[in-house]
UniProtKB/Swiss-Prot annotation:
Keywords: Cobalt, Lyase, Manganese. This is Inosose dehydratase. Its cofactor is glutathione; Co(2+); Mn(2+). GO terms for molecular function: manganese ion binding; myo-inosose-2 dehydratase activity. Pfam families: AP_endonuc_2. Its EC number is 4.2.1.44. Transmembrane segments: none annotated.
Length: 297
């Protein structure tokens, strides 16, 4: 299954959480990438503890035969002047380009509640009006063109608590943006968490999917988040997310759809939970074994 153009990566968020720095504050950058390599992963996304000096970061990764797959970028197209987002995006793009990454993960954070510790994730979500949708789509097309200038692709990350979370919102985004400039990051965990049919979304947009986050969920924890009106970050602390093979999502059909459509790019494990409860190395190995078992990668 899969051709040689599919690579496996893992996100540092299991070791150190950028949104809640107390989670994994004891884990160093070096420990993080060493354990990723030890678990059998090739790529990583960029975390807060990663050096931003290209030379320093490259050397640390090359010693472990690793590379940067991408890094998250927060856009504020619906709440701030476009120029502010563009300036930050160009800087981000150039750093990732220097690191050899091919995709740029973008999420609209205007009106987002994902980082609010007390706002219930299932109740407090903002919904864009038509004018805001237009602004978002136009801005993303411009950023996508800037990515293309460097031979890179903008991959949009639908995410819990943001203005693009549901199937309906993904449909709208895909419809309003240029398919040659704005691509999709498929995240299994965020779709299932939201109550969407992740497989159907993948089937519909598989040809625009250029980056994949493999995230599993624990359904009973998500139900708890819903019932107790918890925030996204409270849900993370509760253990709503975990690695593929440890939760309730069946990844076999997901792998099959990607393989059948000749997916190329990264399959990147991203599962934020408390490292004091879920040992990052242990869970990285667990994820790696599961992927090997299901895909032979």
């Amino acid at each position: 299954m899969f051709n040689s153009n599919v690579k496996l990566g893992i996100a540092p968020i299991a070791w150190t959480n950028d949104d809640m720095p107390d989670l994994g504050k004891e884990n160093t950058f070096e420990q993080c990438i060493s354990e990723m390599a030890l678990a059998g992963f090739k790529g990583s996304e960029v975390g807060n503890k990663y050096p931003r000096d290209v030379k320093v970061l490259k050397k640390a990764l090359e010693l472990r035969d690793m590379e940067i797959a991408s890094a998250w970028f927060s856009a504020f197209l619906t709440t701030k002047p476009y120029e502010e987002t563009e300036k930050a995006f160009i800087e981000h793009r150039d750093f990732l380009n220097a690191m050899g990454a091919k995709v740029i993960v973008v999420s609209e954070q205007g009106h987002s509640i994902q980082g609010q510790m007390e706002t219930p994730i299932f109740d407090g979500k903002y919904v864009l009006n038509e004018e805001e949708w237009k602004t978002l789509a136009e801005g993303l097309n411009k950023l996508g063109a800037l990515a293309k200038e460097k031979g890179m692709k903008l991959v949009y990350h639908h995410h819990m608590g943001t203005v693009v979370q549901t199937t309906e919102e993904i449909d709208k985004l895909m419809d309003l943006t240029d398919e040659n400039l704005v691509y999709l990051l498929f995240d299994s965990g965020h779709l299932v968490y939201s109550g969407e049919d992740a497989l159907e979304v993948l089937k519909k947009y598989v040809n625009r999917v250029k980056h994949v986050h493999l995230k599993d969920i624990r359904k009973e924890k998500v139900e708890e988040v819903k019932r107790d009106k918890l925030s996204f970050l409270q849900g993370v602390r509760k253990g709503a997310f975990t690695v593929p093979g440890d939760g309730d999502i069946d990844f076999e059909p997901i792998f099959k759809v990607l393989d059948d459509n000749n997916y190329e790019g990264y399959l990147l494990v991203e599962a934020e939970q408390d490292p004091a409860i879920a040992n990052p190395l242990e869970y990285a190995i667990k994820a790696r074994k599961y992927i090997k078992e299901k895909t032979n990668l």
